[in-house]
């Protein structure tokens, strides 16, 4: 049995000090749980914070934007608008395509949203056009999310129609079945089909019309049930040659008889194997390709999903002919893994730096080993809790652990330093551990809970930003709690077992030199502190000036939302004149692609032209530029973008918009630039009046660059003005006119060919090669009442007009989206304020509304809540400290250190040229928790000296400052060095980590210098104030 000195209670640490084996096994259990938990943690770029988003796509080839809006989009919107939990509904109706994007509240499960969407589509079915080729198709993806993986399928021996058929049936379906895949899209549009190109002159000479041909084809190709025969002994299934499956069969089809002679389809049309839509095309590095974009489901594990796809690719490619090549052009997980690896390295570097600082101060290997064990144990133990909470290894949780390195060592340092002090005075190690741990136990508890209190407001942040930082805050809080447990259990036990007077007194030349240096520093600090205490009002003036300076810096510093990351992938939009055709766009993308691929930083490029639901209009093309790895190129992504735009600028009549892809996607539609602002009206006419005015005003603002809008109302349209009286007299209905036009120019899908593996379409159109443009309309013939044919020009007048290329809605009303970037030298906050000022200047009417979208809207919300977030952190800490100290006064003394941290952080951000964004604000909030530690350590010892030794407040705080100077300096440097790797990071994802490191290092440097002098002065000021209150209200025996 161990003999304990009287009074050596040890507080909460007593049991663990006296039972070292049990303590060791308990810590081993924490370590083992953390190691096992780490193996089960998924890897991601950021915490999963996706809004539940569903996209509904309806294709109606040949329909104008106006027809798509009124007959497809509007009926769907009316049903979708009745769904509960819907946050925002946007739609885009263009030629032949309607896309409705539904964004739901964060609290609504995606499966519930899916059920509501399916029910709404079913309810709208009867209102949709009866001749839709396919019903509306929904997918659980955010269209603005960049694909997690892009694959290109090429062949130098096979036509693209055959390649797409194989990819669709053998590859895309298998990838779609992978867990986590939300949607696999094939860009390139080369689905096989039988194309029937009518010769207008030939059918007119025979007295036929396109409707006659269409009816003949649809009647000749069917695939329906025919029944069976059931006899006394045998059953027979009925079958027939009702399907035609080759172009040759269609050529031989008899469509009419003239003077008893058959007229075959091949006589009046060119029938060939081709693509279902001839106005779609994709290229990979300028070679024709089928491009597969794989998007994940919201909430899916991106790393696990990509790994599953890569594992099955070899098996899938083996099923394809050797001439077909499948190439992975981009894989977002490559950069995610690199970013996580860099952050893990910075975490290990932070641990090494912290241990180095410990050794520099303690100059004793056993004393250094103790916190050297406490730090990794606290961090590894956190993994076990992260698994339980369904967290992931991502940039934010790793940043939390890196910052925690400086936090968790603080507790161990404070305990070791206090126990070592008693051992050096001659106490036995066991007695010193019990006495030192018992004395410091309340301080550890105060430090822990006051620091966790700072993180509490982060847990209550609303919307997507709150979800984003919940994992960060909880991970850090768990690490701090485990650190407190380790510091009150393992650390004093190890001190009792490993420290001794001999080990602490054993010094070499380096130790003695460091000791002399520290003694001189403490002596200099003592002299300076004495002078400061003799001139308190000057010190208070400095503290007040610091507060004012922090407010001023907060006002002037540029403000942003989220750091722009370099993920190695650039999304682009190529814009051409609104009347551009598919052929001209294909030629322009080739010119642009040639110049982009010449850039040394570009690794691969995919381009797409055509309208397919993802690309809204024919005069725009989509690009995805994949850059070389960061260590293989000299420039960051923004420099590459500037260089590419300069290279393309000399190509006439095209505009290239580029933006880097981001891990955090808040938008619900693909934009030309990073930020969006919408203008909404009740009618298209009102919108057309105000869009040019606002766009011109925005383009003149220096705070904005690359301003553009999706308002396109100058597309060419041929208006067929039918003379209804003349048409009626001839027995021709408006439906007949529409059918004739659709047959000729709509790439009309008139029949379906069924096979065992897939279904293919028969496409009807006029061969317009000999009569291009509006002249082709003159070849249209219609059947009159007497059976003859009438030219369209006999009953209609053709006019050329301007019409919108697409019609966009936001919550069922017409809307235009303005896209913009922020030029160098300005911040997002500057741009937002400039837009708001412009809006006031224009004096928009009441029926015109504006709203920021996506990340700009989130920035506004975050900016409005930032001040309240910091205030909430301060109030939470005050409440916790007030409860712990049973005092209204001492928490104020501790919190008086906070302005110094704010000044240092803001100055560091300004000097580094960094914006005050969400990451930097989190750093400032963490500083609130770190900086107050200095004051807590001073005040705890001062109060103990007053209470136990009867010292005066001045002598008590003076002695406390000198006694706690070394641990204060040690813990501050540990926290600083824990943040230093983040500040100096240069690898993948460094843009995300650097603002946090800059804010924390700057705040710690300034606050360390100032709080050592301002805290004791403020302590004495409030002590006098407390005495004054007691003298005025003597009935209050206890401190108010």
Curated annotation (Swiss-Prot):
Gene3D superfamilies: Multidrug efflux transporter AcrB pore domain, Multidrug efflux transporter AcrB pore domain like, Multidrug efflux transporter AcrB TolC docking domain, DN and DC subdomains, Multidrug efflux transporter AcrB transmembrane domain. Signal peptide: none annotated. It is a multi-pass membrane protein. The keyword Cytoplasm does not apply. Pfam families: ACR_tran. It is found in: Cell inner membrane. InterPro entries: AcrB_DN_DC_subdom, Acrflvin-R, Multidrug-R_MdtB. The keyword Cell cycle does not apply. Belongs to the resistance-nodulation-cell division (RND) (TC 2.A.6) family. MdtB subfamily. Part of a tripartite efflux system composed of MdtA, MdtB and MdtC. MdtB forms a heteromultimer with MdtC. This is Multidrug resistance protein MdtB. It comes from Salmonella paratyphi A (strain AKU_12601). The lineage of its organism: Bacteria, Pseudomonadati, Pseudomonadota, Gammaproteobacteria, Enterobacterales.
